[in-house]
Amino acid sequence: MCCAIWSASRAPACSASQLSSSHAVRPSVVPDANPRAAPRYSPDLRIQCTSGTPRPCGSSPLAIVTSRETARATTPSAVPNGASVSNSPCATAASTGAGALDPPVRSSISNSRRGPTSGSVRGRPRCSSSVRSAAASACSRASACIGARCHTVTNEVAPPSSASATRIAPAVTGSGSPSADSCTAPPSSTADARAPRSADSAAVCGQPRRLTLCRCARPSASRASSQAAATPGSSNSGARGSGRSVITSHASRPLIASSPTVQRNQTTVHQQTCEGPTCVQRSVTRLTAMSNPSHAEVPSAYPPPADFAANANATGELYAEAEKDRLAFWEKQAKRLSWQTPFTDVLDWSDAPFAKWFVGGKINVAYNCVDRHVEAGNGDRVAIHWEGEPVGDARSITYAELKDEVCKAANALTDLGLVAGDRVAIYMPMIPEAIVAMLACARLGVMHSVVFAGFSASALRARIEDAEAKLVITSDGQYRRGKAASLKEAVDEAVADQPSVKNVLVVRRTGIDVKWTDGRDLWWDETVEQASTEHIPAAFDSEQPLFLLYTSGTTGKPKGIVHTSGGYLTQSSYTHWNVFDVKPESDVYWCTADIGWVTGHTYIVYGPLSNGVTQVVYEGTPTSPTEHRHFEVIEKYGVTIYYTAPTLIRTFMKLGHQIPASHDLSSLRLLGSVGEPINPEAWRWYREHIGGGKTPIVDTWWQTETGAIMISPLPGVTAAKPGSAMTPLPGISAKIVDDEGNQLVPGADEAEHVTGYLVLDQPWPAMLRGIWGDPQRFKDTYWSRFAEQGWYFAGDGARYDSDGHIWVLGRIDDVMNVSGHRISTAEVESALVGHAGVAEAAVVGASDDTTGQAICAFVILKASAHGGPENMIEELRAEVAREISPIAKPREIHIVPELPKTRSGKIMRRLLRDVAEGRELGDTSTLVDPSVFEAIRASK
C-alpha cells in the first residue's frame, strides 16, 4: 500500500509542500511512479480522507491511498461489467437522477479480466474490509484526518477503444444529502443490460455529505470525440474532429487546460464537498503515463469573452471598410496622427517596388509620440514605468517629463553638429535614456541605428561602418543576471579608426570604470542634462528616413533595413491600437522585447507612445534574480496587456505552472506572441496559466521588413486558433502560393498539409523602403522570386487550414523536402513538444542520399519524463507519425541538455544543421553559450 499527499490544482490552491508539511504524511512510494511495471488496465483505488470540518488551504489534509491488493479485492468477480461492488454498506454517488452515468462508458476489457458477466445488479454495493482497513490506516497517519469522512473513488482506466468523459454526482434525498445506509447501484435498462458500464463510481462512507465529482476519462487513440455530461452550473465543449474536449467546473474554468498531449496522461478529479452553506473545493490530478496515450479533447478555437468583444476597439466592420476601399481605409488611419502639412495622395506606386505613402504630407514623429499628448492635457499620465534589473531600481516618467527629456537630448545633439539625414548608432541597455535618444533623433530628422547591446564589438563595428554613423550613444555598462557588464569597452573597440564617428555619448548606468578618450567621449549627464527643455520640432516629409535597423542576411553581411516616417508611424499606431485593444486611460502595457529589435522599435517606442499609453519597460532578464521576476512586475504595476515571445513562454513552461500560479495575474486581459510561430501547446499553456484561462491571445506575424504587424487575430472579433496567425489585418493583403504563383486552396484539416510561400501582393504603409546603400540587393532579396506578379516574398512557408486561416510555418529554409513531401520544421517541433516528456525541441533537415533530406531532431526532456532515452526516442518517432505522417518521422532524435540560442532567444538551426551533417560549425559569435555544442555533439 502506498500513501501520498496530493495537492489541489484549483482553489483552494494548496501546494504539496503546504499539505505535507502541515500533517507529516510522507509517501513511502509515489503512486504510479513506475506505471510501466503495472498492468495497463488494472484498476486502482483512491481513498481521499478529508477532515470533518472544512478548513482553509493548508489545514485540511488530503491523503491518497493506492493498493494493488486492495484494488484486486474490490474488482468484481461474479457481477456484471461496470458494477462497483463492496462488502459493507455505503452510498454510491451515482444512484439516481443526476447520479446516472451519462453517457455509459463502453469498455472492451475482456471477461477474463473482469469476471463473468450476466444480468443486471441492483441493490446495495458493499465496501470490502480491505478497503476499510486501507482507509483507516491512511487516515490514522494524518492526525488531522482522524474521524474524517472518506470518499472513495474506484477508477478503471479504459482501453484505447473506449472514449468517454463521465460525470458522477450523488443522488440527493429530500434533505439534500444521500443516505449512508440506503444506496443503489446506477440504474440500468433492459436495452443496455448487456452493455458494459463504466467502472467509475463514487462512494460516500460515513456521515451524509453532498459530493460533486467530475472525471474526464481519456478518449480513444483513434481520436473519436466524446461528449461530457454537464453538471448543473458547468459546461463542456469539444473541437471538431480533433479528438479533444474540455470539461469546465462550476466556475466555467477548464479542468483540462493544457495541451492534449499533456492531459492525455492525466486523470483529473474536481471535487466540491459541502456541509450546509460551507463548501470545500479541490482538484486532484493523477498522472497515468500510459504507454500508448490518446488525446483529450480541447477547443480548436477560442472566441473572445463577450465583455471583451463588446468593448473592443476593433469590430468586424473594420474588415469590410478596408475591403471596400483599401486606400481610403489607410487615409483614415493616417488622419489619427497630427500632420503639419496634410498629404495630397495616399500612395504612389509608380516606381515599384519603391513606395511613397501619404505623398506631400509633413509630420514629426516625436511630436506625435510625446508633445501632442501633453498639449491634450495628458502630461501627468505615466508614459513609462521603468524597472531596472536590480530589485528596487525603478522610476516612473510622465509624458510631460518625457517631453522635457527628449527636448534636452535634441538640443544636445544639435549642439554636437547633427542635422537631418545624419545617422546615430545607439548601443544601450533597456533604460529610459535609450528611448529618449531614439525620440530625440526622430525629432531632428536624424536616422537612428539601434544595435542590440548583446552584440559583439565586431558586429557593432560593421553596423557603424555601414551606416557611417557620426555619433554613438552608449552606457558605461549594463546589468545582466545581477552583474554589471561593460558596454563602453565594446564601443571603444568598434569605433577605433572609424573616420565617421565624431563623438561617443555615455550614460552612467552601473558606475563601473571606463576608459576615456578626451575630445571624443562625453558624459550624458554633463551634456544632455544641461541642455534646454525648450525645442520646437520641425516637420519632415512623410518619406523622411526614420531609422536603420540591421537584420541578418544570407550572404553574411547584415542588411540595413530603411523605414520612413509617415507610413511607418501610421501602421505602427493603427496596429498597436487595434491588435492590442489599448485603452490609454486604464491599460498598463508591457512588451518584453529589446529596443535592439524591430519589435522594440514598433511596440515599445513608436506604437505605444503614439497612442498615449502607459507601459512597462524592464531592463533585465526574465529570471533575475529569480524566475518570479516577470510575474512580480506584472503584479507591481497591474499590467493588463503582455506581449512576449514563444521562447520565453516555453521557458516559463519548463519552470512550471506553479511559478505564475503563485502570483496575482488577474489584471491581465490580453496576451500577445511575437518572434516565431508559437506551437499550440505553448499557446494553450500561455492562456491557461498566465491568462487565467480567459484572456484572448494575439499571435502576430510580421518582420523587420514589414515594420508592423501584418497577420493577427483582432482580439474582440476573432475566435483564435492555437498556433495560427489567422488572417491578414484589415488593410493588408497576403496570400499563400505555390512555386508558380498559384494561390493554394484551403485543405482538409486531416489531410496532408500543403505548404506554400507567403507573399504580400499589395503595398502597405510601414513597408521597408530599401536596403541602405544597396537598392539592387533590395530588389533581389524581396521582389525577384515573384517579379512577374510584383509580389513581396516574405521568405516564410505557410499553409491554409480548412477554414482558410493562415498557419505560418517559419522560414522557407526551415521547410524540408523529404521524398518529395514538404514538411515544416515547425510542424515537427510542435509534435515533439506536444509529448508530455518534452520541454523543447529543434528540428533541421539534413542531406540524405535516399530521401533528399532527412529530419533530425534535437530534444530537451523534462525532468519528469519517464523511461530511458531509447524508449523515449521511439515514443517520439511514433508521436510525430501520429501527429503529422509516417513520412515525417525523424531519422535521428538526439536528447540534449540545451539548444543553441542567440541573445534574442532564437534557436540557431543553421548551426544544428552543421552538426547534423557533420560539418564544421559556422559563426557562433551571436550565441549566448557556444559551448553548448560540446554537449550536443556528445549526444550523437
Swiss-Prot record:
Catalysed conversion reaction: acetate + ATP + CoA = acetyl-CoA + AMP + diphosphate
Compositional bias per record (Polar residues), positions renumbered to this chain: 72-95, 107-120, 258-274
Enzyme Commission (EC) number: 6.2.1.1
UniProt PTM comment: Acetylated on Lys-906 by Pat in the presence of acetyl-CoA as an acetyl donor and ATP. Acetylation results in the inactivation of the enzyme. Deacetylation by the SIR2-homolog deacetylase CobB is required to activate the enzyme.
Top-level taxon in the UniProt lineage: Bacteria
Keyword terms of this UniProt record: Acetylation, ATP-binding, Ligase, Magnesium, Metal-binding, Nucleotide-binding, Signal
Positions of the UniProt region annotated as Disordered: 70-127, 157-202, 224-274
UniProt-recorded Gene Ontology molecular function terms: acetate-CoA ligase activity; AMP binding; ATP binding; metal ion binding
Region of interest (Unknown), residue spans: 1-289
Residues noted as binding CoA in the record, renumbered to the chain: 480-483, 599, 819
UniProt: Mg(2+) binding residues: 833, 835, 838
Single biological process term from Gene Ontology: acetyl-CoA biosynthetic process from acetate
Swiss-Prot/TrEMBL cofactor(s): Mg(2+)
Signal peptide range in chain numbering: 1-33
EC top class named in words: ligase
Region ranges (Acetyl-coenzyme A synthetase): 290-940
Compositional bias of kind Low complexity: 184-202, 224-245
Family: Belongs to the ATP-dependent AMP-binding enzyme family.
Role this protein plays: Catalyzes the conversion of acetate into acetyl-CoA (AcCoA), an essential intermediate at the junction of anabolic and catabolic pathways. AcsA undergoes a two-step reaction. In the first half reaction, AcsA combines acetate with ATP to form acetyl-adenylate (AcAMP) intermediate. In the second half reaction, it can then transfer the acetyl group from AcAMP to the sulfhydryl group of CoA, forming the product AcCoA.
Name of the protein in question: Acetyl-coenzyme A synthetase
Source organism of the structure: Mycolicibacterium smegmatis (strain ATCC 700084 / mc(2)155)
